[in-house]
Amino acid sequence: SNQTGFLLQGDTPKEESANSGASWKVMRDEAYAPCATDMGSVLHTYMVVGPGDEIRGDRFPWGWEQKDFDDAGWQEAMQLNTPVVTAGYGTDNMWTLSPRSIPQMESRMQRLGIVRRESGIRTDAAFLSGLHPLTVPGHTKISLLLDQSFETVAYTVIRLSEGKNAEVKLTYAEALFDEHEQKGNRNEIAGKSIKGLYDIFYPDGQQNR
């Protein structure tokens, strides 16, 4: 497909009530915006990944999945043509879907490994295992270098409480850069800095976001 869309379709008649269609309602989530759009020039290389996400908690429709959520301001979904096109050219090939014939991708939780470097705060690895939160005092700037110790393909799940008007920036990289813009040994961090794709979160000040 060269344009985005969404289709939910059950395999049996039991799921028909949940199938996507004209009865669905939609809204544009204003909490999300692209960031890290200049990584090609920053890293002086060709980038083959999309931008990062800038997420503003005070614009997110919290509770949208709850039964009593007020969706009066949402619009009716626009139903497109058939999603299956066997052949065609031009506009008849904008939204093209076909059933997958291969297994689903692996999905499991991975927790980050260790804290390699810290600035502005003293911490331990217990918060990485989920045993207790990392508490950052107000009007404080901290920096943590977290090492997974192996390369992986994953997406970030972060839980935030309070911290209204704070900024949380997560930068991802396979290795650090030295003063000559070289990566070298991935295990070495002394005198090196991180450059890479990043996401930014702006908490709304509430609990367990």
Give the ranges of each region predicted by the language model:
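Extracellular/oxidizing-compartment recognition motifs
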Residues: S1-R209
